[in-house]
Regions:
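Acidic (Asp/Glu)-rich catalytic clusters
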Residues: 13-33, 48, 52-58, 95-101, ...
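Acidic-and-aromatic substrate-binding clefts and catalytic sites of carbohydrate-active enzymes
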Residues: 5-15, 39-45, 111-119, 146-147
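Hydrophobic alpha-helical segments and helix pairs
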Residues: 67-107
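Active-site gating loops and adjacent loop-to-helix segments of metal-dependent hydrolytic enzymes
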Residues: 42-78
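Hydrophobic faces of well-ordered beta-strands that scaffold small-molecule active sites
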Residues: 3-5, 30-36, 106-110, 138-140
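Catalytic domains of cell-wall/extracellular-matrix polysaccharide-remodeling enzymes
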Residues: 90-148
């Protein structure tokens, strides 16, 4: 019942425009979910602001496993602060593209469930708290075994 939107993909604007052109034709209006992407594509924050997350060209360079490992390192706060910048920008980009959303109605998910990695989860919840956002939904790992 929702559409996941990845703000940092090259087709983002094209997808937003496609949705806008077709939205009146939908039988029901889907909810929009921010699909955080910290593993692929280009950082919205820019290489100069998140140098430990991206390569020289601004493409994400860390794997799921590396992010998990970083969660337990003494240097985790350095990474967490950079993750916060990227997470905040990705959420704001989606909300700006869909003004009918509010920060109280946002739904949050992530590519490969990275938002459940400890350092990423800490960054996400700090951003939510600092911005005083009240998400409607944050996906967790409790998935139904059967669809019915």
């Amino acid at each position: 019942n929702s559409i996941s939107v990845l703000a940092n993909m090259s087709c983002f604007e094209e997808c937003v425009n496609m949705y806008r052109r077709e939205q009146d034709e939908f039988v029901w209006q889907p909810k929009i979910s921010v699909h955080l992407n910290l593993l692929e594509g280009i950082s919205l924050a820019g290489a100069e602001n998140v140098p430990d997350l991206v390569n020289r060209d601004g493409h994400f360079k860390l794997s799921w496993e590396k992010l998990f490992f970083i969660s337990f390192l003494p240097s985790r706060n350095k990474f967490k602060n950079q993750l916060k910048k990227e997470i905040e920008l990705q959420i704001k980009t989606v909300v700006d593209a869909f003004p009918e959303l509010s920060f109280k109605a946002i739904r949050i998910d992530s590519h490969q469930h990275t938002h459940m990695i400890p350092v990423v989860a800490d960054a996400l919840f700090e951003v939510i708290g600092e911005q005083k956002w009240q998400p409607e939904y944050i996906r967790d790992s409790r998935e139904p075994m059967m669809p019915f």
